């Protein structure tokens, strides 16, 4: 785009958002500005632009602008547009998952649970945690120290003897009254102290209890409390960092770059406990400055996730507008800090070291994947190999048939392009017909709309499935995609697969062939994606059919029963009185349900 001085002069000196648009109308880049005229004009005055920006400017046809009241409002609009439009030259962080929490339920004997979503009012949630592993690790540690139950309420209410967790000293067995309500409530209260970061107060409390027991010559209790103190010390050593006052809750965001790979590491500290780390890798981040990547992450990530009162960052960023926006989003004052001392400086160094390790691993993986892709391309004698699609079929004796399609593009699996297909209208258990139907579903619209076709199409199966795939592609007029079946062979052992071409030719690659490893990776991912979809569909169908086949039970009552008892097994375990206690279930209907399930 050449410089249009009249256009630049017409821009207001107000905050707002600008969009770089190409000749086809596609938005290439979205940015925000405190002063639109200055910011947009800077693109045409600077001579030291990054290669990424120079490439973008060559494609820009025109620039659209939107004026906002404040810079913070511009920042919010910018990031909403980036998430919605996904412009090619913006740094984009994808993070669609909600964060998990550790839950203490509001039951008379509260249980520890892993949870995502909005907790019920009577439950207490602690977190968020960066990943499910961190929650489960915390639950295991709390079980060791406080022996709180983790079983579902339906299981708890129907036990007649302690489970294995009691035998290995991970649960005090309140289900069969091996612990008093008062003692269990005290254990819950102490666990909550630990989760809230009051570990010092908890240690002092248990120490006082131990000393009191020893003075009363209750040496058994004193020894038990001594062991609890030791386990608590282990937990503190493993999860706690040195914190004081309001600094006990913070996120630490650090960025690093290795071999062209940028990684952002998010470290979560809640109640003085280091809950864990999570790494993020931006799309379109090539050539971006570290501060630019970090600012993009903070702005995009916290639009959809809980915001702590303090965020420590490893790079200096333009934090004024960002701080205002985050404070408005959180409904409280949020502080962004870069230049810090003492323990907070140590936290940033720790997060930065983790970011560097993540970038190093991703860089090594990328090099390895590039080698695999090149080896497979050369072996199959393909001019280009950028996109691979793989299909798999999953069912149980013909029930709940699901076809999966996974995509490998560039040097990684492209999960946004994954698809599952419900296969109906075929003979149950007919894998050949299922494969034919799946391919027709996948490529019918692609052909009509002139969409993207893969360079290589993998079919998890032998000659029969390959023949069906050939037939389906022929029906659609597709003849420029290399088709390859991946047959497991008689022994079905990994590493002994045979590759089958569309014309029936067979190819066996060495077990250590890099290209063969790539095929296995994509095939295994297709299998995983198919089987998880199949299990979900099968489980849903079985629950629906089991309850809805009972006279008087429709979708609404089925939902009430499942929510009340925590699942179908809980409904099965419930007696007539328990069933009749559910809203909308009369005693007569409860007896019908009980008899139908037994």
UniProtKB/Swiss-Prot annotation:
A Pfam family: UvrC_RNaseH
Main location: cytoplasm
Intracellular or extracellular location(s): Cytoplasm
Keyword line: Cytoplasm, DNA damage, DNA excision, DNA repair, Excision nuclease, SOS response
Self-association and partners: Interacts with UvrB in an incision complex.
Gene giving rise to this polypeptide: uvrC
InterPro entries for this protein: GIY-YIG_endonuc, GIY-YIG_endonuc_sf, GIY-YIG_UvrC_Cho, Hlx-hairpin-Hlx_DNA-bd_motif, RuvA_2-like, UVR_dom, UVR_dom_sf, UvrABC_protein_C
Entry keyword annotation includes Electron transport: no
GO cellular component, one term: cytoplasm
Annotated protein name in UniProt: UvrABC system protein C
Domain UVR: 200-235
């Amino acid at each position: 785009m050449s410089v249009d001085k009249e256009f630049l002069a017409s821009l207001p000196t107000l905050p707002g958002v600008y969009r770089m648009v190409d000749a086809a109308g596609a938005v290439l880049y979205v940015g925000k500005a405190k002063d639109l005229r200055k910011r947009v004009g800077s693109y045409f005055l600077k001579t030291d632009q990054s290669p990424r920006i120079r490439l973008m400017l060559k494609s820009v046809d025109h620039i659209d602008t939107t004026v906002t009241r404040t810079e913070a409002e511009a920042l919010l609009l910018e990031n909403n547009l980036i998430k919605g439009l996904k412009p090619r030259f913006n740094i984009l962080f994808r993070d669609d998952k909600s964060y998990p929490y550790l839950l203490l339920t509001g039951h008379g004997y509260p249980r520890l649970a892993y949870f995502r979503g909005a907790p019920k009012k009577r439950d207490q949630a602690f977190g968020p945690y960066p990943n499910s592993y961190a929650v489960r690790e915390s639950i295991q540690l709390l079980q060791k120290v406080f022996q709180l139950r983790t079983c579902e309420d339906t299981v708890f209410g129907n036990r007649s003897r302690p489970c294995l967790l009691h035998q290995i000293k991970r649960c005090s067995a309140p289900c069969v009254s091996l612990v008093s309500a008062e003692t269990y409530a005290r254990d819950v209260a102490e666990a909550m102290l630990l989760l809230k970061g009051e570990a010092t107060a908890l240690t002092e409390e248990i120490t006082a209890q131990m000393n009191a027991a020893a003075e009363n010559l209750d040496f058994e209790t004193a020894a038990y409390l001594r062991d609890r103190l030791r386990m608590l010390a282990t937990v503190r050593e493993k999860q706690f960092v040195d914190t004081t006052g309001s600094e006990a809750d913070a996120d630490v965001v650090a960025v690093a770059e290795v071999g062209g790979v940028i990684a952002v590491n998010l470290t979560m500290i809640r109640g003085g406990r280091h809950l864990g780390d999570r790494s993020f890798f931006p799309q379109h981040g090539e050539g971006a400055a570290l501060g630019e990547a970090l600012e993009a992450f903070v702005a995009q990530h916290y639009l959809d996730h809980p915001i702590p009162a303090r965020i420590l960052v490893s790079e200096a960023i333009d934090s004024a507008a960002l701080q205002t926006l985050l404070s408005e989003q959180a409904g409280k004052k949020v502080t962004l800090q870069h230049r810090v001392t003492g323990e907070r400086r140590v936290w940033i160094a720790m997060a930065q070291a983790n970011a560097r390790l993540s970038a190093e691993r991703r860089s090594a993986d990328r090099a390895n994947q590039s080698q695999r892709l090149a080896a497979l391309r050369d072996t199959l004698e393909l001019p280009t190999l950028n996109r691979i699609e793989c299909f798999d079929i999953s069912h149980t004796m013909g029930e709940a048939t699901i076809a999966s399609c996974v995509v490998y593009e560039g040097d990684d699996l492209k999960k946004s392009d994954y698809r599952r297909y419900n296969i109906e209208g075929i003979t149950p258990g007919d894998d050949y017909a299922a494969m034919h139907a799946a391919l027709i579903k996948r490529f019918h619209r692609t052909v009509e709309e002139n969409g993207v076709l893969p360079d290589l199409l993998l079919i998890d199966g032998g000659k029969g499935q390959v023949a069906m795939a050939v037939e389906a592609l022929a029906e659609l007029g597709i003849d420029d995609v290399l088709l390859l079946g991946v047959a497991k062979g008689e022994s079905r052992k990994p590493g002994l697969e045979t590759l089958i071409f569309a014309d029936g030719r067979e190819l066996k690659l060495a077990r250590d062939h890099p290209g063969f490893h790539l095929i296995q990776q994509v095939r295994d991912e297709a299998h995983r994606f198919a089987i998880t979809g199949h299990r979900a569909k099968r489980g849903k169908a079985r629950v629906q059919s089991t309850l809805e086949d009972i006279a008087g039970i429709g979708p609404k009552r089925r939902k009430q029963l499942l929510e009340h008892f925590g699942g179908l097994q809980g409904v099965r375990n419930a007696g007539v009185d328990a069933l009749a206690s559910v809203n909308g279930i009369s005693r007569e209907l409860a007896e019908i349900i009980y008899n139908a399930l037994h």
